[in-house]
Amino acid sequence: MAIKLEDKKAIVAEVNEAAKAALSAVVADARGVTVGAMTGLRKEAREAGVYVRVVRNTLLKRAVEGTQYDVLNDAFVGPTLIAFSKEHPGAAARIFKEFAKGQEKFEIKAAAFEGKYLAANEIDVLASLPTRDEAIAKLMSVIQGATSKLARTLAAIRDQKEAAAA
């Protein structure tokens, strides 16, 4: 079915805005995935702040032109499902990776992060990035461990001086 020129321009503009605001992008082939499964994927993506859209390849190439995601042009072959992470760089990769475990026909093609192309086998790097809260928790545990070690050392020195004075 042919799409009107105005509709094509609107799609390109919408995807371009999503690309400009995104932290990372993941491209997949969803051929053979049921409508119910895709609906669940879209719902999960929406909740995680991920923009998901099926777009024609020619429109997608125009939409990402001039953005950090034009490195993905070679991955725009066949039916293309693209996801842009708006809040966390690894969100789209994590969602697609989890979804692919239950759907054997769902194939992740590639990803892009900070203008760098990541092949499908490298997507684990992006998916394993800690969320902001996880990173803060790790940092706080490191800081807390260092301060408690310092406090124990100071207490040991104090105890040694008290023992020597007694």
Swiss-Prot record:
Gene3D superfamilies: 3.30.70.1730, 6.10.250.2350. GO terms for biological process: translation. One of its GO terms (cellular component) is large ribosomal subunit. Keywords: Ribonucleoprotein, Ribosomal protein, RNA-binding, rRNA-binding. Transmembrane segments: none annotated. CDD domains: Ribosomal_L10. GO terms for molecular function: large ribosomal subunit rRNA binding; structural constituent of ribosome. Coiled coil: none annotated. It comes from the Bacteria. Forms part of the ribosomal stalk, playing a central role in the interaction of the ribosome with GTP-bound translation factors. Belongs to the universal ribosomal protein uL10 family. Part of the ribosomal stalk of the 50S ribosomal subunit. The N-terminus interacts with L11 and the large rRNA to form the base of the stalk. The C-terminus forms an elongated spine to which L12 dimers bind in a sequential fashion forming a multimeric L10(L12)X complex. This is Large ribosomal subunit protein uL10. It comes from Pseudomonas fluorescens (strain ATCC BAA-477 / NRRL B-23932 / Pf-5). The gene is rplJ.
